[in-house]
């Protein structure tokens, strides 16, 4: 995720999120978004935004879901951003070309680099994330849980069930 003086993955605070907790957090996000809408469509930032976008779209009753693919992570290192796939012309037209009435959803805003790039493409869209870190938080319109910048979130789709040693044995 980071480079240089930033903490390595091993030095970060682990924050495991279960499927149940993630679903509850997405529903809480939707509850907040309900007061902000209405929205014409959901735009998921792939890949992390796919699952929360599906939950949010269901809860808001939205059927139009599009994706924007911005790549910044290679395993545990954060690199240069690239838009690998933009929103469709149909979705962009729903937002008048500026994103008005579109809801951008991602799992997390970290440094804000991805959010800035998407904001540049859809400046009038509403940007929502489930989790937010301090550096990226100013870019997000709506989020549920703030975590510290040195936190590494383990999302349920990135983890498997395995034995965890007790904390007294030096487990993180």
From Swiss-Prot:
Pfam assignment, any one: Pribosyltran
Residues involved in Mg(2+) binding: 107
Binding site for GMP: 110-114, 152-153
Membrane topology, as annotated: Peripheral membrane protein
GO biological process: GMP salvage; purine ribonucleoside salvage; XMP salvage
Binding site for guanine: 110, 153
Keywords: Cell inner membrane, Cell membrane, Glycosyltransferase, Magnesium, Membrane, Metal-binding, Purine salvage, Transferase
Molecular-function GO terms, alphabetical: guanine phosphoribosyltransferase activity; hypoxanthine phosphoribosyltransferase activity; magnesium ion binding; xanthine phosphoribosyltransferase activity
Cofactor: Mg(2+)
Chief localization: membrane
InterPro entries: PRibTrfase_dom, PRTase-like, Xanthine_Guanine_PRibTrfase
Binding site for xanthine: 110, 153
Domain of life where this protein originates: Bacteria
EC number: 2.4.2.-, 2.4.2.22
SUPFAM superfamilies: PRTase-like
Residues holding 5-phospho-alpha-D-ribose 1-diphosphate: 47-48, 106-114
Tagged with keyword Transferase: yes
Catalytic activity: GMP + diphosphate = guanine + 5-phospho-alpha-D-ribose 1-diphosphate; XMP + diphosphate = xanthine + 5-phospho-alpha-D-ribose 1-diphosphate; IMP + diphosphate = hypoxanthine + 5-phospho-alpha-D-ribose 1-diphosphate
GO cellular component, one term: plasma membrane
Location(s), subcellular: Cell inner membrane
Pathway where it operates: Purine metabolism; GMP biosynthesis via salvage pathway; GMP from guanine: step 1/1; Purine metabolism; XMP biosynthesis via salvage pathway; XMP from xanthine: step 1/1
UniProt key word Flavoprotein: no
Function: Purine salvage pathway enzyme that catalyzes the transfer of the ribosyl-5-phosphate group from 5-phospho-alpha-D-ribose 1-diphosphate (PRPP) to the N9 position of the 6-oxopurines guanine and xanthine to form the corresponding ribonucleotides GMP (guanosine 5'-monophosphate) and XMP (xanthosine 5'-monophosphate), with the release of PPi. To a lesser extent, also acts on hypoxanthine.
Subunit structure: Homotetramer.
Family of the protein in this entry: Belongs to the purine/pyrimidine phosphoribosyltransferase family. XGPT subfamily.
Stated name of the protein: Xanthine-guanine phosphoribosyltransferase
Encoding gene per record: gpt
């Amino acid at each position: 995720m980071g480079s240089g003086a930033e903490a390595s993955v091993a030095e970060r605070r682990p924050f495991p999120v279960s499927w149940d907790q993630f679903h509850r957090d997405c529903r809480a996000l939707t509850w907040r978004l309900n007061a902000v809408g209405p929205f014409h469509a959901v735009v998921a930032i792939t890949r992390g935004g796919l699952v929360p976008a599906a939950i949010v779209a269901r809860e808001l009753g939205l059927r139009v879901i599009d994706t924007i693919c911005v790549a910044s992570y290679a395993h545990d290192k954060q690199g240069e951003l690239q838009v690998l796939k933009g929103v469709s012309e149909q979705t962009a037209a729903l937002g008048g070309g500026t994103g008005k009435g579109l809801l951008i959803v991602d799992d997390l805003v970290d440094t804000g680099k991805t959010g800035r790039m998407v904001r540049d493409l859809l400046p009038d869209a509403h940007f929502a994330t489930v989790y937010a870190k301090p550096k990226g938080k100013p870019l997000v319109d709506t989020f549920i849980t703030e975590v510290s910048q040195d936190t590494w979130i383990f999302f349920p789709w990135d983890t498997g069930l395995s034995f965890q040693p007790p904390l007294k044995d030096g487990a993180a």
